[in-house]
């Protein structure tokens, strides 16, 4: 006889207050992070309000990109995305499309066709293989890449707050299953963050929205269409209490899919016009991706956009126009498909269109005019709410929840109830799906049921855990399998085995089984966990992450020291060659000595780009020891020689 494990229940967001206050550990300032497929965003609850924090480039959203340069430097965020076209094979993005999934997952197989970097199979999971500089190849788990993005968000918050950040609330799509949620928590651990809560993106958006809408009961529909995922949630908000009534969506629909359609259109068009297939040139495809994304954004506010790419392919330029009408035509089936989950959510919550009080649009893709029009038409002309920046709403809500967990009183009596998005059940004789937890059950939840053996003296039962709505398990999604062994010999149907499913506040499942006859209790490990990182792997990845940070620091120091020597040598060279300045004041002997010393160092630099910090420092000191006495003699003082830094400001005085 067989059973199943719980899906990705939607997280409960329980904003507890005074009763936890006494026993709460000091967690410092907890940050809220929207770890997105394409962009990430971080916020903090401070002085009674949410601050969305800008990164070092001044941007409030950061690309979820990590790159490794040929020089061995690691770039994260804007810097990584900006060099995508020149280094596509070693620029990693869309890690969220791979996290917590198995190699054989059809969506993984579909995705890797379009990713410019190499994805390989390791321990039945997709791993990312890149050249990290110096001819070294390294494979990373998707969790490690996500951890690097989380580290960037953590550092962004630390720079703003002026102190260390150790605890966070991180958001995931409502449809993420157990493995994907666990993998996201693991990414936090690797980044040195204690992820206190995993919360659903639409839930977070509802919190952001709910803060200023506190009177009476309201039905809110959250329509969240981002770069990689689509979620629809129906929430009721009553005096600060949120309840997620129903959710639906598509884990694999978003802005990137719209870009892909446009790219395919232009690749075909280019082949038709020139007979050339650009697909085989990664760099050309990435250039096109970048320009198509820009054009798509422009079309939200204008009716046509020009796509110009210099030396696009084999030295030829690319120049085409994309109209809003063409963009809509290429994606119309995808746009229309977003209405199905909206319909489903209304059916699940027994509500009519007219019962919806507010429609909240979240995610950058909801800026597309056609999407806004379809939503408005679906709700018979009702205008969606525009009170929230769609890029920041999720991080905003996560920051409010983080404020609650920090013990910040200003968030008030905010409570949020969440639900399990799919029915969870087990397989019983004949491949029947026996339901344990119906979809849209509020979590956290715990359900138990008694099962028995299917044959005489059966020592083991195999339990298969499924999620889905179909009556037969073959049509549903297998989440995991485990065995309960050591059942004493008995006729079929006699042993009583109590199986308990428990979903915690993060929507993560625990399964316990108890043989009622013997009182033997076993905690069951779902084989799904085998796709998770082991504690040892996580520890190794944490160490790797620390090592990377250390290497990044060392590399920067080395580059800075090299630059100091270089600018010092060139500054001297320029001044010696300038008759108005140092060149006109030196004796020919001193001039020759200095010129020779400077040339030696410049030649040495050209052939020793990869020297150690100590070598650069030593060479600079050697040069100073030759130059210093000459300059001192010239000025009759023991003042320091001109340095590279002084070059710009002190130049005129020499």
Swiss-Prot record:
Residues 632-654 are annotated as: Disordered. Pfam families: HSP70. PROSITE patterns: ER_TARGET, HSP70_1, HSP70_2, HSP70_3. The modification 3'-nitrotyrosine is found at residue 160. Its EC number is 3.6.4.10. Residues 1-18 form the signal peptide. Residues 125-280 are annotated as: Nucleotide-binding (NBD). A motif (Prevents secretion from ER) lies at residues 651-654. Residues 409-419 are annotated as: Interdomain linker. One of its GO terms (cellular component) is mitochondrion. GO terms for biological process: negative regulation of apoptotic process; negative regulation of IRE1-mediated unfolded protein response; negative regulation of protein-containing complex assembly; post-translational protein targeting to membrane, translocation. Keywords: Acetylation, ATP-binding, Chaperone, Cytoplasm, Endoplasmic reticulum, Hydrolase, Isopeptide bond, Methylation, Nitration, Nucleotide-binding, Phosphoprotein, Signal, Ubl conjugation. Changing residue 525 to A: Does not affect AMPylation. Endoplasmic reticulum chaperone that plays a key role in protein folding and quality control in the endoplasmic reticulum lumen. Involved in the correct folding of proteins and degradation of misfolded proteins via its interaction with DNAJC10/ERdj5, probably to facilitate the release of DNAJC10/ERdj5 from its substrate. Acts as a key repressor of the EIF2AK3/PERK and ERN1/IRE1-mediated unfolded protein response (UPR). Monomer and homooligomer; homooligomerization via the interdomain linker inactivates the chaperone activity and acts as a storage of HSPA5/BiP molecules. Interacts with DNAJC1 (via J domain). Component of an EIF2 complex at least composed of CELF1/CUGBP1, CALR, CALR3, EIF2S1, EIF2S2, HSP90B1 and HSPA5. Part of a large chaperone multiprotein complex comprising DNAJB11, HSP90B1, HSPA5, HYOU, PDIA2, PDIA4, PDIA6, PPIB, SDF2L1, UGGT1 and very small amounts of ERP29, but not, or at very low levels, CALR nor CANX. Interacts with TMEM132A and TRIM21. This is Endoplasmic reticulum chaperone BiP. It comes from Cricetulus griseus (Chinese hamster).
């Amino acid at each position: 006889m067989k059973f199943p494990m719980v899906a990705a229940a939607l997280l409960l967001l329980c904003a507890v207050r005074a009763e936890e206050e006494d026993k709460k550990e000091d967690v410092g300032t907890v940050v809220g992070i929207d770890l997105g497929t394409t962009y990430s965003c971080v916020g903090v609850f401070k002085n009674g309000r949410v601050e969305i924090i800008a990164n070092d480039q001044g941007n409030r959203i950061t690309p979820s990109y990590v790159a490794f340069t040929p020089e061995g430097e690691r770039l994260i965020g804007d810097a990584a995305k900006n060099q995508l076209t020149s280094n596509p094979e070693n620029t990693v993005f869309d890690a969220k499309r791979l996290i917590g999934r198995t190699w054989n997952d059809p969506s993984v197989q579909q995705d890797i066709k379009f990713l410019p970097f190499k994805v390989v199979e390791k321990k039945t999971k997709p791993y990312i293989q890149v050249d990290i500089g110096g001819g070294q190849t390294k494979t990373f788990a998707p969790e490690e890449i996500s951890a690097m993005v989380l580290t960037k968000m953590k550092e962004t918050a630390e720079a703003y707050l002026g102190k260390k950040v150790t605890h966070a609330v991180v958001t995931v799509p409502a449809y993420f299953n157990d493995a994907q949620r666990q993998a996201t928590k693991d990414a936090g651990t690797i980044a040195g963050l204690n992820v206190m809560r995993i919360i659903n993106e639409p839930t977070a958006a509802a919190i952001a929205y709910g803060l200023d809408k506190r009177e009476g009961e309201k039905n809110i529909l959250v329509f969240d269409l981002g770069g990689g995922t689509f979620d629809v949630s129906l929430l009721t908000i009553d005096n600060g209490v949120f309840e997620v009534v129903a959710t639906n969506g598509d884990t694999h629909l978003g802005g990137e899919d719209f870009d892909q359609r446009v790219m395919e259109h232009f690749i075909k068009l280019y082949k038709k016009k020139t007979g050339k297939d650009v697909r085989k040139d990664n760099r050309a495809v990435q250039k096109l991706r970048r320009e198509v994304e820009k054009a798509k954004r422009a079309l939200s506010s204008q009716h046509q956009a020009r796509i110009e790419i210099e030396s696009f392919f084999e030295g030829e330029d690319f120049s085409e126009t994309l109209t809003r009408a063409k963009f809509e035509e290429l994606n119309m089936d995808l746009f229309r498909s977003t209405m199905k989950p909206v319909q489903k959510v209304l059916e699940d919550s027994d509500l009519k269109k007219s019962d919806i009080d507010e429609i909240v649009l979240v995610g950058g893709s909801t800026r597309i005019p056609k999407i806004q029009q379809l939503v408005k038409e679906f709700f018979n002309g009702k205008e969606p709410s525009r009170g929230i920046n769609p890029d920041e709403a999720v991080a905003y809500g996560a920051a409010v929840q983080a404020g609650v967990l920090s013990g910040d009183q200003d968030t008030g009596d905010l409570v949020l109830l969440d639900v399990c998005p799919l029915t969870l059940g087990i397989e019983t004789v004949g491949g029947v799906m026996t339901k344990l937890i119906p979809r849209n059950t509020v979590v956290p939840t715990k359900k138990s049921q008694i099962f028995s053996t299917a044959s005489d003296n059966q020592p083991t039962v195999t339990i298969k855990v499924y999620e889905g709505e179909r009556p037969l398990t073959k049509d549903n999604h297998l989440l995991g399998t485990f065995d309960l062994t050591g059942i004493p010999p008995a006729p079929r149907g006699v042993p009583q085995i109590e199986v308990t499913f428990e979903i915690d506040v993060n929507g993560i499942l625990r399964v316990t089984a108890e043989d009622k006859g013997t009182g033997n209790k076993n905690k069951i490990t779902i084989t799904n966990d085998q796709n998770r990182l082991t504690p040892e792997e996580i520890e190794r990845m944490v160490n790797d992450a620390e090592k990377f940070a250390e290497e990044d620091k060392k590399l920067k120091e080395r580059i800075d020291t090299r630059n100091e020597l270089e600018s010092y040598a060139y500054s001297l060279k320029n001044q010696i060659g300038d008759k108005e300045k140092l060149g006109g004041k030196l004796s020919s002997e001193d001039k020759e000595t200095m010129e020779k010393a400077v040339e030696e160092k410049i030649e040495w630099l050209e052939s020793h780009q990869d020297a150690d910090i100590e070598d650069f420092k030593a060479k600079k000191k050697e040069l100073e020891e030759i130059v210093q006495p000459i300059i001192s003699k010239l000025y009759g003082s023991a003042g320091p020689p001109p340095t590279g830094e002084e070059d710009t400001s002190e130049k005129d005085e020499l």
